[in-house]
Swiss-Prot record:
Cofactor annotation: pyridoxal 5'-phosphate
Top-level division of the source organism's lineage: Bacteria
Modified residues (N6-(pyridoxal phosphate)lysine): 233
HAMAP family named in the record: SHMT
Assembly with partners or alone: Homodimer.
Subcellular location: Cytoplasm
Species: Solibacter usitatus (strain Ellin6076)
Recorded catalytic activity of this chain's protein: (6R)-5,10-methylene-5,6,7,8-tetrahydrofolate + glycine + H2O = (6S)-5,6,7,8-tetrahydrofolate + L-serine
Gene Ontology biological process terms from the UniProt entry: glycine biosynthetic process from serine; tetrahydrofolate interconversion
Upper lineage: Bacteria, Pseudomonadati, Acidobacteriota, Terriglobia, Bryobacterales
Family the entry assigns: Belongs to the SHMT family.
Name recorded for this polypeptide: Serine hydroxymethyltransferase
Gene expressing this chain: glyA
Length: 426
């Protein structure tokens, strides 16, 4: 066999174990209801770009200023991604090289604050993110973190507390954004608070960027100095990151992405980002995002009607945070029981949680992935009923088996990657 012939073999021929794992994962995604709020399903076009020959290319630097030759088409890809993201979000500056949302945040920190500086962010236990100041994360290890919280009475961000803390601690940067906060964030109020103390205002919109792109959520680019995001989740692109900012921060951000925190960018992933931004610029994307929010609201109301407590009383976004501890349950057992019914969620802390993070008081639900499948409000109400049925019969495997059959009926009605269905093995 020649080297050319060897390189032309299929994955199934070269590595049947990995091939089978992919087949099984495809079947799993097709046969389960994906309700993890941070997950979604990309288009075939995004998958194709991610698996393209740009995987082979090294391209340290930026368009027109590379440290490697042969980057003319890489420059085309990166420029298209930047131009489309700028148009999509109305940003003056764009960097599409970050490998992830966390690395986007790390580069943004490095551009505007120094080690030891004071930074404010939403407490992880109240819905924030690891990179907003958790003690075990680079952010908590490198900077002096002052967390702010939600109010106990309504589980909404306490903007008066944010302002009081900002005036007391004089932070160099204030972060707005969350991983488990279901309500619209008042970016204008944050901007006013940041201006009052001379702080840089950064928004991490990783969870809501798709909603923002479609105009169904306020755009943080109108208020923030720097905006970071992932490109998967609601944006429905590849697993990666992006930074948007006012032009005056561009040079420092560029330096902190490369060479500050990364070497060569993942060109194949930048190509997939460009595709996802183009998809998000289409009118039908706004229709999809409006349905995402409508579906989350329908799911939340269905669970409330079934007697469950939804954190903050509902949702304005794609996220529903469910308090299961009030029903005598814990997040871990709830996640596992729902998984047996082929409903995928994640255990999650709720505000003022007294239970440990690995077995907290809640579960987090999200509507993006099932909306991609075609679910609307009626299906979401049915899903809420199925979740309630499992959680009120958590030790009854007969009930769970019955729910599993109903889930199978739903996934059959709304196939995922239907062109793959006949080729995969469960």
């Amino acid at each position: 066999m020649t080297e050319s012939q060897r390189m032309s073999r299929t994955l199934a021929e070269v590595d049947p174990e990995i091939y089978q794992a992919i087949q099984h994962e495809t079947a799993r995604q097709d046969g389960q209801l994906e309700l993890i709020a941070s997950e979604n399903f990309t288009s075939e076009a995004v998958l194709e770009a991610t698996g393209s020959v740009f995987t082979n290319k090294y391209a340290e630097g930026y368009p027109g200023k590379r440290y490697y030759g042969g980057c003319e088409y890489t420059d085309v890809v990166e420029n298209l991604a930047r131009e489309r993201a700028s148009k999509l979000f109305g940003a003056e500056y764009v960097n599409v090289q970050p490998h992830s949302g966390s690395q986007a945040n790390q580069a943004a920190y490095g551009a505007v604050v120094s080690p030891g500086d004071t930074v404010m962010g939403l407490n992880l236990a109240h819905g924030g993110h690891l990179t907003h100041g958790h003690a075990l994360n680079f952010s908590g290890k490198t900077y002096k973190i002052v967390p702010y919280n939600v109010r106990k009475e309504d589980e909404l961000i306490d903007y008066d507390e944010v302002e009081k803390l900002a005036r007391e601690h004089q932070p160099k940067m204030i972060i707005a954004g969350a991983s488990a906060y279901p309500r619209i964030i008042d970016f204008a109020r944050f901007r006013k608070i940041a201006d009052a103390v001379g702080a840089v205002f950064l928004v991490d919109m990783a969870h809501i960027s798709g909603l923002v792109a479609a105009g169904v959520h306020p755009n943080p680019c109108e208020f923030a100095d720097i905006v970071t995001s992932t490109t998967h989740k609601t944006l429905r692109g590849p697993r990666a990151g992006i930074i948007l900012a006012r032009e005056k921060y561009g040079k420092e951000i560029d330096k902190n992405v490369f060479p500050g925190t990364q070497g060569g960018p993942l060109v194949h992933v930048m190509a997939a980002k460009a595709v996802c931004f183009l998809e998000a610029l289409q009118p039908e994307f706004a229709v999809y995002q409006r349905q995402v929010v409508a579906n989350a609201k329908a799911l939340a109301q269905s669970l409330i009607d079934a007697g469950f407590r939804v954190v903050s009383g509902g949702t304005d976004t794609h996220v529903v945070l469910l308090d299961v501890f009030s029903k005598g349950l814990r997040g871990k057992e709830s996640e596992q029981a729902l998984d047996r019914a082929r409903i995928t969620v994640n255990k999650n802390a709720i505000p003022f949680d007294t239970n440990p993070p690995m077995n907290p008081s809640g579960i987090r639900l999200g509507s993006p992935a099932v909306t991609t499948r075609g679910f609307k409000e009626a299906e979401m109400r049915e899903v809420g009923t199925l979740i309630a049925e499992v959680l009120t019969n958590i030790a009854n495997e007969d009930v769970i088996a019955g729910v599993r059959q109903k889930v199978q009926a739903l996934t059959t009605r709304f196939p995922l990657y239907s062109w793959k269905r006949d080729t995969v093995q469960a």
